[in-house]
């Protein structure tokens, strides 16, 4: 039976096998593992790509958010407004600094709605933190204006947003800081965990650079409390290679998304991600291709029988319904758009191993499912 996996991690290795193996030998032969030149070069190259002043490699995306919030002084008694359509890590990072995550509903793009965010502002609010999900930016012009008007920090969880733009600005560069994840499933992933923080604030960058290394400054003197959250030099070396090929990867992901759009766009049973044409402020990079589907669970089972891997994000449960976390349910009002979305959401395969024939097979299988369903 034909197999089209949702993830294809071996495919990433096989694509660059010779180069990855050479990088491993080079870094190991130099014994260059922690805070070495490969990390410094990666930070410089990524900053150049994003047109941002500072990039700091850290242990993972959750650490990146935690360090950024901590550096801004957000803590006990404070509130941070986020979208409920996000990974639990976003809320966890806020809890880790002692603050409270406050959920505001999503808009038609299933990203943080500026109007909903405005309705959740209180005297305790310190920041607005949109998640740039699936490779698409939220309405950053409106969110930035909302933050400025209310004297709030604007910070970004851009774990899934590397390369996405709103207007001429990249995800992760709109506010005080933005964060990235290099988890293997991300747009450029490493062989394990990794993350980064982006900022244009010199003082904030200096503080976070010390905080990621036990509070030590550039000469090794401990100047503040910190933690161990350094992106390994070996991972940075791998990521430098991935970054070199990132533009071609984005082009291919957009081609796959366009093929899905053309093949599935006439199915009334499905809702597809918005397309970003030249008139749109969005430039999407499609980390995931998340749609909505009638008879979602039956469709997913049918595709599985066809050898097609799919995924329901966060296990089909938005963060505000994670009962064991005790966020304070009285603050989880007016999230109906999110709840409706999670009843129908489904992610189709979107990885760099997909061929056009693979995509067409997915399209044909979905079309076949609805054709059979409509005849019953």
State what each model feature region is:
Residues 10, 37-44, 49-53, 127-131, ...:
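PLP-dependent aminotransferase class I/II
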Residues 1-32, 37, 349:
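N-terminal "arm"/small-domain region of PLP-dependent enzymes with the aminotransferase-like
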Residues 32-79, 93-97, 103, 169:
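Phosphate-binding glycine-rich loop
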Residues 111-120, 168-178, 360-361, 366-368:
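A short alpha/beta connector and helix-capping loop motif
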Residues 56, 81, 102, 154-155, ...:
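Structural detector of well-ordered beta-strand residues that form the stable sheet scaffold
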Residues 180-181, 195-200, 240:
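Short beta-strand-to-turn element immediately C-terminal to the catalytic PLP-Schiff-base lysine
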Residues 70-158, 165:
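PLP-dependent aminotransferase-like
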Residues 156-191, 206, 218-223:
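Conserved active-site segment immediately N-terminal to the catalytic lysine
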């Amino acid at each position: 039976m034909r197999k089209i996996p949702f993830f294809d991690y071996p495919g990433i290795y096989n694509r660059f096998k010779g180069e990855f193996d050479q990088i491993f030998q080079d870094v190991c032969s130099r014994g260059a593992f922690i805070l070495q030149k490969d990390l410094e070069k990666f930070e410089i190259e990524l900053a150049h790509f994003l047109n941002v002043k500072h990039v700091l490699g850290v242990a993972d995306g959750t650490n990146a958010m935690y360090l950024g919030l901590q550096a801004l002084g957000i803590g006990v008694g404070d509130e941070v407004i986020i979208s409920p359509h996000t990974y639990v890590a976003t809320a966890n990072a806020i809890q880790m600094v002692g603050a409270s995550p406050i959920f505001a509903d999503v808009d038609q793009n299933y990203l943080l709605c500026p109007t909903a965010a405005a309705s959740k502002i209180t005297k305790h609010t310190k920041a607005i933190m949109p998640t740039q999900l699936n490779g698409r930016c939220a309405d950053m012009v409106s969110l930035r204006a909302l933050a400025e008007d209310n004297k709030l920090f604007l910070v970004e969880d851009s774990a899934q947003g590397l390369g996405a733009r709103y207007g001429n600005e990249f995800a992760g560069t709109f506010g005080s800081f933005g964060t990235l994840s290099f988890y293997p499933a991300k747009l450029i992933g490493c062989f394990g965990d990794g993350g980064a923080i982006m900022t244009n604030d010199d003082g904030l960058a200096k503080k976070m650079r010390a905080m990621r290394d036990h509070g030590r400054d550039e000469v090794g003197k401990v100047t503040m409390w910190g933690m161990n959250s350094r992106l390994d030099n070996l991972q940075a070396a791998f990521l430098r290679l991935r970054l070199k090929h990132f533009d071609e990867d984005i082009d291919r992901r957009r081609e796959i998304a366009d093929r899905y759009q053309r093949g599935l766009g006439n199915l009334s049973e499905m809702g597809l991600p918005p397309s970003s044409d030249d008139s749109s402020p969005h430039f999407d990079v499609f980390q995931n291709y998340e749609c909505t589907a009638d008879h979602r669970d039956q469709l997913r089972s049918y595709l599985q029988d066809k050898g097609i891997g799919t995924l329901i994000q966060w296990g089909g449960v938005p963060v505000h319904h994670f009962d064991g976390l005790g966020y304070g349910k009285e603050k989880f009002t007016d999230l109906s758009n999110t709840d409706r979305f999670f009843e129908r959401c489904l992610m189709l395969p979107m990885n760099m191993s997909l061929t056009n024939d693979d995509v067409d097979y997915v399209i044909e299988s979905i079309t076949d499912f609805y054709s059979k369903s409509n005849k019953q």
